[in-house]
Amino acid sequence: MASSCSIRCGSRNILVNAAATFLALLVVLRCFANAEKPSPCQSDVYCRGELLHTIQMASIYKDSKTFVDMKMKRPPDETLKSFREFMERHEQMPTRYQIERFVNDTFDPEGSEFEDWDPDDWTFRPKFLSRILDDDLRNFASELNGIWKMLGRKMKDDVRVNEELYSIIYVPHPVIVPGGRFREFYYWDSYWIVKGLLLSEMYTTVKGMLTNFVSLVDKIGFIPNGGRIYYTMRSQPPMLIPMVDEYLKITHDYEWLENNLYLLEKEFDFWMTNRTVEIEVDGVNYVLARYNEQSSGPRPESYKEDYLTSQSFRTNEEKDNYYSELKTAAESGWDFSSRWFILDGTNKGNLTNLKTRYIIPVDLNSIIYRNAVLLAQYNQRMGNESKVAYYQKRAAEWKRAIQAVLWHDEVGAWLDYDILNDIKRDYFYPTNILPLWTDCYDIAKREEYVSKVLKYLEKNKIMLNLGGIPTTLEHSGEQWDYPNAWPPLQYFVIMALNKTEDPWAQRLAYEISERWVRSNYKAYNETHSMFEKYDATVSGGHGGGGEYEVQLGFGWSNGVIMDLLNRYGDKLTAEDRFVATFHSNSTPQPVVVSTAGQVMTGILALVISLAAGFIGKMRCANNAAQ
């Protein structure tokens, strides 16, 4: 019997037979097309319409995001009236120079929504610095602590009073932004920012950011991709509940939890209601989550780029489906990556082959499982027994589904699932081991899972890259592909391995941490900048590719490094060394210093050392079995 999947679309269920996958795409797209798609937001200035199209296609600015972050000088109706008169004066064909003058006359520069803000809870020397023994790394962490003040943003009260003049979404409390072109808060970035802020003892700032987030859930129904109205049809990986968990571990502010638990549940319900899909495997139906944005038109912040690439499609329906795929990939946080390409059942192709809506991601579902577990715990604390049972049931169902649909025993990892071709996607991503972090597997078989995952990582040669773990092994030119290494993915792998309590996995977690910290430290020393992403192939190199230049700042990069320095600060050193011995106690360990000419020898020794660990582990397991 051929396996099949049931895809929920609106109120209907569509049964997709794997033997006829060429019909699957047609059926699903037709279902999506039955209802007219809404625009990214209701603004005829920032999200849709002739004004947006004319200005963005004129390429006044190098970055399309610049215009849609500007403030209108007059109300929207007056702005649109001025635009119509402008177009009439120039017979509907203004020059680029004339369009630029119109924009300068009609809009204030980007960033006009903010005022200076000096956080009251910032401290010059947070306690975690004392746990970092290496002087250079301690100074590095101290400087990262200072960067929070540069990344802090507080909105002017005028944004609240005259919200229609801005594309930014008003929130009552100051925020820490990623940096560079990202002038507003971003959803999943904020998890690592919060981790760093908590180490910096900026508890009031964190509480304000969490309060901002739940206010958005209350207002919009979920947390958007970022703090602009053009993001309000898409979200990002649902990291709010894990953020709250980090805050509660440090502050024990259960009054905040009691007041806002219903909003955490509301966000969870959004994902259950709007982002789930039924899949049948071996005659059993499972429910898992996917990313799925459904608005029309190009992304306003990348309007020209999207519009031009859409011209390879013939019909408006095909173009709108392509736009939805672009925005769905943005919702995933991985915009863009060959991870979301489907071409003849493979990950080959280019942006026109994006099929993010038809891929069940390991990481998204692992996070949703963890959210259900945490909501059960929170309701237990509040005495809501019926809700405890509900979330425990959800978590158990999710764990079973992840095991049945995503785990590949022969590969030794969890794999994304392609619902068009009804296959697991056997391509390396750091997120393929994320269930180890969220405990979304049979803990009783931990040793078996860990052994297979370690062999999987060794097979994919993750330690052959001096600058970190690459995002994928594909050379597509997209920024979420090789050779870029992204901070959150390093964090996921390190924490997943460390949480197993397996000494070999924890050793590997330490060595990945050491390599990542040293690469970031080297880049910072040479440029006095923290980057959004790094080059996996070289220590100290920043990443590239994608739609925009590499960004400085940078929120999640700082948070990850601070967390690793707090965790391993009693062992890490700034110099380029390869650890000769490592134990789990707190005593600093002896190291062997390598010269630049010995780098490859050191890598080889490290790989051999790990391989020996794998072999020894398997022998011990075999002896025990005998």
Swiss-Prot record:
One of its GO terms (biological process) is trehalose catabolic process. It comes from the Eukaryota. Substrate binds at residues 181, 188-189, 225, 234-236, 299-301, 333, 547. Glycans are attached at residues 104, 274, 350, 384, 498, 525. GO terms for cellular component: membrane. It catalyses: alpha,alpha-trehalose + H2O = alpha-D-glucose + beta-D-glucose. GO terms for molecular function: alpha,alpha-trehalase activity. Stable up to 40 degrees Celsius, but activity is lost after 15 minutes incubation at 60 degrees Celsius. This is Trehalase.
